[in-house]
Amino acid sequence: MAAVNCHFFQLSRHLKPSRPSFSCSASQPSQNNIKVIINGAAKEIGRAAVVAVTKARGMELAGAVDNHFVGEDIGLLCDMEEPLEIPVVSDLTMVLGSISQGKEVGVVIDFTDPSTVYENVKQATAFGMKSVVYVPRIKPETVSALSALCDKATMGCLVAPTLSIGSILLQQAVIMASFHYNNVELVESRPNAADLPSPEAIQIANNISNLGQIYNREDSSTDVQARGQVIGEDGVRVHSMVLPGLPSSTQVYFSSPGDVYTVKHDIIDVRSLMPGLLLAIRKVVRLKNLVYGLEKFL
């Protein structure tokens, strides 16, 4: 609901004495606000993003796109106190067209699917809109194609393997520790078995590979499946567990004789990703090319 601002005006003393007069007008959203379109708005993370963007300073929700719940008010779908008067639509192009006519700064958040993300960013770019992409399992060749597209169009795009600031801090701590320990194993738990090892686990293993360190020299065998999967050529072992009911958890164990260093991070709720998402929105509007990884802005 728009806020109402009331301004009082005292009449000049040179005129006839009179009571003060006032006028009221419903305030409109600032023209400087970042207009945000959420593609995949009906998903759990999309709904959390709707709430976060609506409450954030300097940005406003301009569109909700999804193939499910078409026609429903996105505010009511997200259990907000009042409707946002923004219906869910299935046509991204229609929303992009309405925003681009106002020549306002716009960002499309993409929570969709690896198979559609390139076309989504291409459409957003054609309408002069920046993109934030959080699509697990996105292929490296897709990222390369997006990078070429953004370079040609001089348009910003942020591809984020994770929006979790805690996860990024864990990865940074792991890289630092890898220079001081020769033994490392990663244990993760996920509520479902959609992707194992998870993209995050693979990224952590890749981050600490090719740093001139060979890990777990005394147990380099890959014959025993119970010892986990070796990722990369430097011996990083990953153990993946599927435990419904528990939070998504990542633990990295480093050890040397008489010393164990453990780094752990849990994601209990999708809302934990929202600070990272809002940071991504604020940073991508200044970009003129593709940047891979939210950690570039921490």
UniProtKB/Swiss-Prot annotation:
NAD(+) binds at A160, P161, T162, L163. It comes from the Eukaryota. GO terms for cellular component: chloroplast; chloroplast stroma. One of its GO terms (molecular function) is 4-hydroxy-tetrahydrodipicolinate reductase. Expressed specifically in leaves. Keywords: Amino-acid biosynthesis, Chaperone, Chloroplast, Diaminopimelate biosynthesis, Lysine biosynthesis, NAD, NADP, Oxidoreductase, Plastid, Transit peptide. GO terms for biological process: diaminopimelate biosynthetic process; lysine biosynthetic process via diaminopimelate; photosynthesis, light reaction. The keyword Oxidoreductase applies. SUPFAM superfamilies: Glyceraldehyde-3-phosphate dehydrogenase-like, C-terminal domain, NAD(P)-binding Rossmann-fold domains. Disruption phenotype: Impaired chloroplastic NAD(P)H dehydrogenase (NDH) activity, probably due to a reduced stability of the NDH complex. It is found in: Plastid, Chloroplast stroma. Residues 1-25 form a transit peptide. Its main location: plastid. Belongs to the DapB family. Unlike DAPB1 and DAPB2, DAPB3 is unable to complement an E.coli dapB strain. Dihydrodipicolinate reductase (DHPR)-like protein that may not function as DHPR in lysine biosynthesis. Required for both formation and activity of the chloroplast NAD(P)H dehydrogenase (NDH) complex of the photosynthetic electron transport chain. May function in assembly or stabilization of the NDH complex. This is Dihydrodipicolinate reductase-like protein CRR1, chloroplastic. It comes from Arabidopsis thaliana (Mouse-ear cress). The gene is DAPB3.
